Amino acid sequence: MDPESGIVVDNFSTRGSSGQQLGNIPMKILRDYNRLRPYDLIVLQYGLNVAFEGGVNYSYYKNPMIKVVEHLRKAFPQASILIVGVGDREYRDEDGNLRTMPGVKNLIRYQQALAAETHTAFWNMYEAMGGEGSIVDMVNSKPSMANYDYTHINFRGGKHLAGILFETLMYGMEQYEKRKAYETE
């Protein structure tokens, strides 16, 4: 059913998952999958439900995710891997004001470290959203691009951020091709 050319997307959505469960998929199954559907890019976007208000140390998240990235890299050696950092998530402070949950920024640091330690690409969705308090702006946009839980984007928000990610990937490809052309001159 897939076309011979173009982009084909497979989505392994596991709501509320940290992504660590991917490390438990047997290697034989992943290698069979790679033989049938070899991927060019694997995007890992997990962790939003890992973040919590007082979260400072997310080693318990990062260390198992290192194993997940290594597991996927072994199963899909031809594929590039992109880690998408968590987006903005709000909580109400002691005065009842919406604020970016401090644990979000700490988790992003751990996700960046995960990407660096595994030599994996990283895209900062929090910054792409607009940083501090951006989910509030997405909720209040007309039409709304996020849910009133001030945590989850909706389909419009997903489409908006997908467009930003696409432009980022295309810009990266353009820069790569320019560099390769320069190196061959």
Model-found features: residue ranges?
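Active-site segments of SGNH/GDSL-like serine hydrolases
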Residues: 45-49, 71-108
